[in-house]
Protein backbone atom coordinates (compact mmCIF):
# COMPACT_ATOMS: atom_id res chain seq x y z
CA UNK A 1 0.00 0.00 0.00
CA UNK A 2 1.01 3.67 -0.53
CA UNK A 3 3.93 2.52 -2.75
CA UNK A 4 4.43 5.88 -4.49
CA UNK A 5 2.55 8.13 -2.06
CA UNK A 6 3.43 11.83 -2.44
CA UNK A 7 6.25 11.05 -4.90
CA UNK A 8 7.25 13.45 -7.67
CA UNK A 9 6.21 11.15 -10.52
CA UNK A 10 5.09 13.10 -13.60
CA UNK A 11 4.29 10.06 -15.74
CA UNK A 12 4.10 6.32 -15.33
CA UNK A 13 4.14 3.54 -17.94
CA UNK A 14 2.57 0.50 -16.32
CA UNK A 15 3.75 -2.88 -17.70
CA UNK A 16 1.53 -5.29 -19.59
CA UNK A 17 0.77 -8.25 -17.33
CA UNK A 18 0.52 -6.18 -14.16
CA UNK A 19 -2.13 -7.93 -12.04
CA UNK A 20 -3.08 -5.23 -9.55
CA UNK A 21 -2.25 -1.72 -8.41
CA UNK A 22 -2.67 -1.81 -4.65
CA UNK A 23 -4.71 0.55 -2.49
CA UNK A 24 -3.54 4.18 -2.31
CA UNK A 25 -0.50 3.36 -4.48
CA UNK A 26 -0.25 6.77 -6.16
CA UNK A 27 -1.98 8.86 -3.49
CA UNK A 28 -0.96 12.51 -3.64
CA UNK A 29 1.26 12.23 -6.74
CA UNK A 30 0.49 15.83 -7.65
CA UNK A 31 2.57 15.97 -10.84
CA UNK A 32 1.11 12.85 -12.46
CA UNK A 33 -0.86 13.89 -15.56
CA UNK A 34 -1.94 10.85 -17.60
CA UNK A 35 -2.43 7.17 -16.77
CA UNK A 36 -3.35 4.20 -18.96
CA UNK A 37 -4.07 1.08 -16.92
CA UNK A 38 -3.12 -2.11 -18.81
CA UNK A 39 -5.61 -4.80 -19.78
CA UNK A 40 -6.44 -7.29 -17.03
CA UNK A 41 -5.05 -5.03 -14.28
CA UNK A 42 -7.18 -4.52 -11.17
CA UNK A 43 -7.04 -1.35 -9.07
CA UNK A 44 -7.45 -0.84 -5.33
CA UNK A 45 -9.23 1.78 -3.24
CA UNK A 46 -7.86 5.32 -3.36
CA UNK A 47 -5.31 4.33 -5.98
CA UNK A 48 -5.06 7.84 -7.49
CA UNK A 49 -6.57 9.81 -4.62
CA UNK A 50 -5.58 13.49 -4.63
CA UNK A 51 -3.53 13.29 -7.84
CA UNK A 52 -4.47 16.89 -8.47
CA UNK A 53 -2.71 17.22 -11.86
CA UNK A 54 -4.17 14.02 -13.33
CA UNK A 55 -5.99 14.91 -16.55
CA UNK A 56 -6.78 11.64 -18.32
CA UNK A 57 -7.15 8.01 -17.30
CA UNK A 58 -7.90 4.91 -19.37
CA UNK A 59 -9.62 2.00 -17.59
CA UNK A 60 -9.39 -1.54 -19.07
CA UNK A 61 -12.45 -3.60 -19.94
CA UNK A 62 -11.93 -6.05 -17.05
CA UNK A 63 -12.70 -3.37 -14.43
CA UNK A 64 -16.10 -4.32 -13.00
CA UNK A 65 -16.00 -1.88 -10.08
CA UNK A 66 -14.29 1.50 -9.74
CA UNK A 67 -13.17 1.32 -6.11
CA UNK A 68 -13.77 3.60 -3.15
CA UNK A 69 -12.13 7.03 -3.62
CA UNK A 70 -10.08 5.73 -6.58
CA UNK A 71 -10.03 9.14 -8.30
CA UNK A 72 -11.36 11.34 -5.52
CA UNK A 73 -9.85 14.85 -5.39
CA UNK A 74 -8.38 14.54 -8.89
CA UNK A 75 -9.37 18.15 -9.44
CA UNK A 76 -7.80 18.50 -12.93
CA UNK A 77 -9.45 15.39 -14.36
CA UNK A 78 -10.73 16.02 -17.90
CA UNK A 79 -11.30 12.61 -19.48
CA UNK A 80 -12.08 9.10 -18.26
CA UNK A 81 -11.82 6.49 -21.04
CA UNK A 82 -13.93 3.43 -20.23
CA UNK A 83 -13.01 0.67 -22.67
CA UNK A 84 -15.38 -2.04 -21.46
CA UNK A 85 -18.75 -2.88 -23.00
CA UNK A 86 -20.15 -3.74 -19.56
CA UNK A 87 -20.82 -0.76 -17.29
CA UNK A 88 -18.73 -0.96 -14.10
CA UNK A 89 -20.17 -0.27 -10.67
CA UNK A 90 -19.03 2.86 -8.87
CA UNK A 91 -18.08 2.56 -5.23
CA UNK A 92 -18.63 5.51 -2.90
CA UNK A 93 -16.68 8.68 -3.64
CA UNK A 94 -14.77 7.12 -6.57
CA UNK A 95 -15.05 10.40 -8.51
CA UNK A 96 -15.69 12.71 -5.55
CA UNK A 97 -14.39 16.28 -5.82
CA UNK A 98 -13.48 16.11 -9.50
CA UNK A 99 -14.31 18.77 -12.08
CA UNK A 100 -17.96 19.09 -13.04
CA UNK A 101 -16.79 19.19 -16.66
CA UNK A 102 -15.05 15.80 -16.74
CA UNK A 103 -16.06 13.75 -19.80
CA UNK A 104 -16.62 9.98 -19.81
CA UNK A 105 -15.70 8.37 -23.14
CA UNK A 106 -17.14 4.97 -24.09
CA UNK A 107 -17.59 2.66 -27.06
CA UNK A 108 -20.46 3.54 -29.44
CA UNK A 109 -22.19 0.21 -28.74
CA UNK A 110 -22.08 0.85 -24.98
CA UNK A 111 -23.19 4.50 -25.03
CA UNK A 112 -26.84 4.02 -24.07
CA UNK A 113 -26.04 1.46 -21.37
CA UNK A 114 -23.62 3.88 -19.70
CA UNK A 115 -26.06 6.79 -19.95
CA UNK A 116 -28.80 4.68 -18.38
CA UNK A 117 -26.67 3.27 -15.56
CA UNK A 118 -24.70 6.44 -14.78
CA UNK A 119 -27.68 8.74 -15.25
CA UNK A 120 -26.33 11.37 -12.86
CA UNK A 121 -23.56 12.17 -15.39
CA UNK A 122 -25.42 11.11 -18.55
CA UNK A 123 -24.92 14.49 -20.20
CA UNK A 124 -21.14 14.04 -19.96
CA UNK A 125 -20.98 10.51 -21.36
CA UNK A 126 -20.10 10.40 -25.06
CA UNK A 127 -18.62 8.17 -27.75
CA UNK A 128 -17.09 11.14 -29.61
CA UNK A 129 -13.42 11.62 -28.72
CA UNK A 130 -11.74 14.85 -29.87
CA UNK A 131 -8.24 14.75 -31.35
CA UNK A 132 -6.55 18.07 -32.08
CA UNK A 133 -3.82 18.41 -34.68
CA UNK A 134 -1.56 21.30 -33.74
CA UNK A 135 0.50 20.78 -36.90
CA UNK A 136 -0.14 19.03 -40.21
CA UNK A 137 1.78 15.98 -39.00
CA UNK A 138 2.16 14.70 -35.46
CA UNK A 139 2.77 11.56 -33.43
CA UNK A 140 -0.12 9.87 -31.63
CA UNK A 141 -0.94 6.94 -29.36
CA UNK A 142 -3.79 6.08 -27.00
CA UNK A 143 -4.40 3.39 -24.40
CA UNK A 144 -7.46 2.05 -26.23
CA UNK A 145 -8.32 0.84 -29.76
CA UNK A 146 -9.01 3.92 -31.91
CA UNK A 147 -11.41 4.05 -34.88
CA UNK A 148 -10.50 6.75 -37.43
CA UNK A 149 -13.06 5.59 -40.03
CA UNK A 150 -15.33 8.65 -39.84
CA UNK A 151 -12.66 11.26 -39.05
CA UNK A 152 -12.87 12.95 -42.46
CA UNK A 153 -9.63 14.66 -43.46
CA UNK A 154 -7.56 12.91 -40.80
CA UNK A 155 -5.26 10.04 -41.73
CA UNK A 156 -3.58 7.62 -39.33
CA UNK A 157 -0.43 5.89 -40.55
CA UNK A 158 2.03 3.30 -39.36
CA UNK A 159 5.63 3.15 -40.58
CA UNK A 160 6.46 -0.06 -42.47
CA UNK A 161 9.96 0.76 -43.71
CA UNK A 162 12.55 3.51 -43.87
CA UNK A 163 15.61 4.61 -45.82
CA UNK A 164 18.65 5.34 -43.74
CA UNK A 165 19.62 8.53 -45.55
CA UNK A 166 17.48 11.35 -44.19
CA UNK A 167 15.23 8.98 -42.26
CA UNK A 168 12.73 8.78 -45.11
CA UNK A 169 9.74 6.72 -44.09
CA UNK A 170 7.33 4.43 -45.90
CA UNK A 171 3.81 4.74 -44.52
CA UNK A 172 0.72 2.53 -44.53
CA UNK A 173 -2.68 4.04 -43.74
CA UNK A 174 -4.89 2.28 -41.20
CA UNK A 175 -8.44 3.00 -40.06
CA UNK A 176 -8.55 1.12 -36.76
CA UNK A 177 -5.47 1.20 -34.54
CA UNK A 178 -4.85 -1.13 -31.57
CA UNK A 179 -4.23 0.35 -28.15
CA UNK A 180 -0.75 1.79 -27.53
CA UNK A 181 0.20 1.77 -31.22
CA UNK A 182 2.65 4.43 -32.34
CA UNK A 183 1.08 6.40 -35.20
CA UNK A 184 1.69 9.40 -37.42
CA UNK A 185 -1.42 11.54 -37.93
CA UNK A 186 -1.68 13.84 -40.94
CA UNK A 187 -4.29 16.42 -41.87
CA UNK A 188 -5.09 20.08 -41.59
CA UNK A 189 -4.67 21.71 -38.22
CA UNK A 190 -7.87 21.48 -36.21
CA UNK A 191 -9.99 19.15 -34.10
CA UNK A 192 -11.32 15.83 -35.38
CA UNK A 193 -13.64 13.24 -33.85
CA UNK A 194 -12.54 9.63 -33.44
CA UNK A 195 -14.16 6.76 -31.55
CA UNK A 196 -13.23 3.62 -29.66
CA UNK A 197 -13.32 0.49 -31.79
CA UNK A 198 -16.39 -1.69 -31.41
CA UNK A 199 -14.67 -4.58 -33.20
CA UNK A 200 -11.16 -5.84 -33.94
CA UNK A 201 -8.62 -3.20 -35.01
CA UNK A 202 -6.21 -3.57 -37.94
CA UNK A 203 -3.03 -5.59 -37.58
CA UNK A 204 0.05 -3.44 -37.00
CA UNK A 205 2.62 -6.24 -36.89
CA UNK A 206 4.86 -4.45 -39.42
CA UNK A 207 4.76 -1.07 -37.65
CA UNK A 208 8.22 0.27 -36.77
CA UNK A 209 6.97 3.03 -34.46
CA UNK A 210 7.10 2.46 -30.71
CA UNK A 211 4.95 4.67 -28.51
CA UNK A 212 6.16 6.22 -25.26
CA UNK A 213 4.09 8.20 -22.76
CA UNK A 214 7.11 10.05 -21.44
CA UNK A 215 10.87 9.70 -21.28
CA UNK A 216 12.33 6.61 -22.92
CA UNK A 217 15.76 4.99 -23.06
CA UNK A 218 16.63 3.88 -26.60
CA UNK A 219 19.58 1.56 -27.13
CA UNK A 220 20.96 0.14 -30.39
CA UNK A 221 21.00 -3.63 -30.62
CA UNK A 222 23.81 -3.54 -33.20
CA UNK A 223 26.36 -0.95 -34.31
CA UNK A 224 24.85 -0.97 -37.81
CA UNK A 225 21.45 0.40 -36.80
CA UNK A 226 20.48 4.03 -36.26
CA UNK A 227 17.55 4.80 -33.97
CA UNK A 228 15.45 7.88 -34.70
CA UNK A 229 13.31 9.71 -32.17
CA UNK A 230 10.06 11.08 -33.61
CA UNK A 231 8.41 14.00 -31.81
CA UNK A 232 5.32 15.66 -33.31
CA UNK A 233 5.95 13.93 -36.62
CA UNK A 234 9.53 15.17 -37.01
CA UNK A 235 12.84 13.35 -36.53
Predicted feature residues:
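Extracellular/surface-exposed low-complexity segments
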Residues: 101-128
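Consensus positions within tandem repeat domains that build extended binding/scaffold surfaces
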Residues: 1-3, 22-25, 44-49, 67-70, ...
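Structural signature of tandem-repeat unit edges
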Residues: 6-20, 29-42, 52-65, 75-89, ...
Amino acid sequence: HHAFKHSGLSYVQLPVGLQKIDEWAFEGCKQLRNVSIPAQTQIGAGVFYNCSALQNVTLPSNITTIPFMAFSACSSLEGVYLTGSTVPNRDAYCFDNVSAAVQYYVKPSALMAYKSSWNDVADRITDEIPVTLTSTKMTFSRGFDVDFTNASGLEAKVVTDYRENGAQLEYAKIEKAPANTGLILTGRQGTYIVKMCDNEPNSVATNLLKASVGGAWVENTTTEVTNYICVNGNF
